[in-house]
Amino acid sequence: MAAACTRTLGKVGRLVLDTPTCRFTNTAAFVPRTSMRCQGRAYGTGSSGFKSRLLLAAPVRGSGRVLGCAFLLGGGFGLYQTIKLTLQHHLAEKESDASDLDTDLKLTLYQYKTCPFCSKVRAFLDYHRLPYEIVEVNPVMRQEIKWSTYRKVPILMVNGTVQLNDSSVIISALKTYISSKDKKISEILACYPEMKSKNDRGKDVIEFGNKYWVMVHDADADQLYPGKDSRKEEIKWRTWADDWLVHLISPNVYRTPTEALASFDYIVREGKFGSFEGFFAKYFGAAAMWIISKRLKYKHNLQADVRQDLYKAVNDWVAAIGKNKQFMGGDEPNLADLAVFGVLRVMEGLQSFDDMMEHTKVKKWYSRMQKATQHVS
């Protein structure tokens, strides 16, 4: 959760530095997404131990300034080791395997590995066996994309010259290219115009027109969408994945102090912290994420137990597929299948993922999607 941790820990530190005292109470909380463009996450499950729970459950009193410094110090240690671990994983990453498609595209994906939007793009590329290189972006400095005026991930570079932004635009544009075969990527990109505006807080925002549409001729559309409402349903559920499902990930991953600690415990363990560094990174880092994230539950009007929102969303998706189809797309996954799978996949290895598999009907569909998107080695 490097990107979210960076901004969240900074906010917590400044907040606590300006606050006379700070008190923790043992209530559930949720982690905020970072502009909903990239939410990474820390991995790992399992009990954090009785002492761990006591440290978060017990009230903390004292100088707000000292505690704020502790948050920043712990966050800094944790962030450094997280970035180092991410870079180690990146060095071990290989280019994806050969394509089943006759295409001369050279694709480079700039990403955070645990971002659900980046995961969506990888699911699409893997399913279509499109070879691509990965550049893991440093979530703090983002030096890897300093050349880009667009500062969010994923970014996909095509043949080193054409830049595609926004996960849904990337997927729609590439699907158009694969399906039409008579247009250049640069020509297709013009179908998804960038629109700049300001939100109600006066912040600049960027959206993209037509981003859920695959731009093909009628004859190609009939082949691509054989069902009466298949195109409409694909767009509906792709939009749902971006506008609702992705909002449920962070609240469930960091639902309780124990789950937050379990996630940070993984980072500390894999990052080979010293005992002092590990203490601050694990306990203060997890506490910071836990406290700040409380607002997310109210912002998105979630239930007291956010697992129930996740279960309902996933079961709604399975019900929409129906009993007589393997995928939303029928016998093969469509873009909605790939989007939903990409979002849910970032919870793998966490308690929230295990609970979802146990308490919903998604397991069979998810298993089929795993097989469909596997790399060919």
UniProtKB/Swiss-Prot annotation:
What is a single molecular function from GO for this protein? glutathione binding
The identity of this protein, by name, is: Prostaglandin E synthase 2
Provide the transmembrane region boundaries: 66-83
Q: How does it assemble?
A: Homodimer.
Q: Which SUPFAM superfamilies match?
A: GST C-terminal domain-like, Thioredoxin-like
GO biological processes: prostaglandin biosynthetic process
Q: Which residues lie on this side of the membrane: Lumenal?
A: 1-65
Membrane topology of the entry: Single-pass membrane protein
Q: Which InterPro entries match?
A: GLR_AS, Glutathione-S-Trfase_C-like, Glutathione-S-Trfase_C_sf, Glutathione_S-Trfase_N, GST_C, PGES2, PGES2_C, Thioredoxin-like_sf
Query: In which compartments does the protein localize?
Result: Golgi apparatus membrane
Activity control: Isomerase activity is increased by sulfhydril compounds. Dithiothreitol (DTT) is most effective, followed by glutathione (GSH) and 2-mercaptoethanol.
Q: Which domain of life is it from?
A: Eukaryota
Residues forming the GST N-terminal domain are: 105-182
Write out the entry's keywords from A to Z: Fatty acid biosynthesis, Fatty acid metabolism, Golgi apparatus, Isomerase, Lipid biosynthesis, Lipid metabolism, Membrane, Prostaglandin biosynthesis, Prostaglandin metabolism, Transmembrane, Transmembrane helix
Tell me if Transmembrane helix is a UniProt keyword of this record.
Answer: yes
Recite the lineage of the species.
Eukaryota, Metazoa, Chordata, Craniata, Vertebrata
Supply the source organism for this entry: Danio rerio (Zebrafish)
